[in-house]
Amino acid sequence: MSFSDNLAKILDKYDNLGKKLSSGIMGDEFVKASKEYAELEDVVVKIKEYNKAKSELEEANNFKLELGFDNATLAMIEDEIHILENSLPKLERAVKIALLPKDDADSKSAIIEVRAGSGGEEAALFAAVLFNMYQRYAELKGWRFEILAISDTGIGGYKEASASIKGKDVFSKLKFESGVHRVQRVPETESQGRIHTSAATVAVLPEAEEVDIKIEDKDLRIDTYRASGAGGQHVNTTDSAVRITHIPTGITVALQDEKSQHKNKAKALKILRARIYEEERRNKEQERADSRRGQIGSGDRSERIRTYNFPQGRVSDHRINLTLYKIDEVVKNGQLDEFIEALIAEDEAKKLSEI
């Protein structure tokens, strides 16, 4: 089937779904048709824009063949042809991108987890910097950033921290942030002015709803214990801390941030559900090895993806060879869009090349 035939088939399907919805269908049939209709809407808009430009180009070329035009009119026609010829490849690419298989998780909210890696206290301080950077980015996007848990070192660093980020298409924007982030800078405690290298690991998980992942009570082991603060001292006289283990997968989440055991359990279940959903999602992707070849980076938490070099004021993304000399804007102000949009574009380009 040719590209044009495929587009015509999609338009026919969209029109037929519209007629079906107008015919008064009810129940599950209506829900299914409404979902399909909504999913096709974006690509149909792009197909119509592409077809319109294609038709206008054909008309302009035919018009040009007519006799009797003065030079000024002919120049105007040729300008229009030139504009349309330049726009067609862009419009065609937009259609193809809209036709790419969608990641079901892209529209979801996300849970972000940041953990200090190699580098001791400096790594923990960097983990806190990254966590705050994502909080500012969420604020810029108008998303809701809810801190789930923070394990701090007592002097400003985070051993680990997690947050729920709610909003439209959050996961599609943040999913490429998973991996190892490396920092090169002179620690405040360094008297010799030597540059230290340390790292933190970021994991971005699509936030799963109960309809996505059904967790049976019989599959959970829930342990409670007293919360402890920095240095291990007990800060609570009640067993408010919660550790939940999902027995079939072995995934464990421990939380002690809230004074209420009930609140800790609710937050832990939210993180657990996201981790199980992400594991299932990754297993499915692994089965589709051919499509996985087209992804930007593996999304593996052990993959080094970005370096933040403070002395040089640069941030470098190693997957797309993009370096920006604006470290304060990125780290302090959360201006990540230049990296994120470039990563999305590169991912789309790789997938398009495999069509």
Swiss-Prot record:
Segments of this protein annotated with the region Disordered: 281-308
Keyword annotations of the record: Cytoplasm, Methylation, Protein biosynthesis
Modified residues (N5-methylglutamine): Q233
Single GO MF descriptor: translation release factor activity, codon specific
Pfam families for this protein: PCRF (PF03462), RF-1 (PF00472)
Any one GO CC term of the record: cytoplasm
Organism domain of life: Bacteria
Posttranslational mods: Methylated by PrmC. Methylation increases the termination efficiency of RF1.
Segments of skewed composition (Basic and acidic residues): 281-293
Keyword Cytoplasm among UniProt keywords: yes
UniProt cross-references to InterPro entries, sorted A to Z: PCRF, Pep_chain_release_fac_I, Pep_chain_release_fac_I_sf, Prokaryotic/Mito_RF, RF-1
Localization of this protein: Cytoplasm
SUPFAM superfamilies associated with the record: Release factor
Membership in a protein family: Belongs to the prokaryotic/mitochondrial release factor family.
General function of this protein: Peptide chain release factor 1 directs the termination of translation in response to the peptide chain termination codons UAG and UAA.
UniProt-recorded name of the protein: Peptide chain release factor 1
Source species of the chain: Rickettsia akari (strain Hartford)
